[in-house]
Amino acid sequence: MKKILIFFLIIIVLIAFLSLILAITQKVSIGEKKVALIRIEGIILDSRKVIGELREYSKNSSVKAIILRVDSPGGGVAPAQEIYDEILKLREKKKIIVSMGSVAASGGYYISSPADKIVANPGTLTGSIGVIMELPNFEGLTVFF
């Protein structure tokens, strides 16, 4: 009786451990043809994580397409350009589909543009590729001197 209880405890621990591993990595290797999902959310300040995921999926022959879920108001110009360039390279090997969330503006819109297909909700705020640069205007102060 004690051996059966220990056996079932070991099985439960193994199942819990494997479930935890799958939940952390979000990768389930079932089947031959897969679609990968990469989330790009918030302000784009760093490209390393997204580029790392894109490169990882580009090497995986079982991944046939990549969905980019973009929900970003933009961010830094350099990281957006780096992600854009990586998507252009990857597009030669895999299908790229962009799904726009609430906002895909500025850099979010820019990184979406090289995709094979872009899907947006009717209420998605999108567009406006550009850079805003604010400078102080001291023109009125010079009158006093």
Protein language model regions, located:
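Small-residue-centered hinge/linker elements
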Residues: 1-95, 102-145
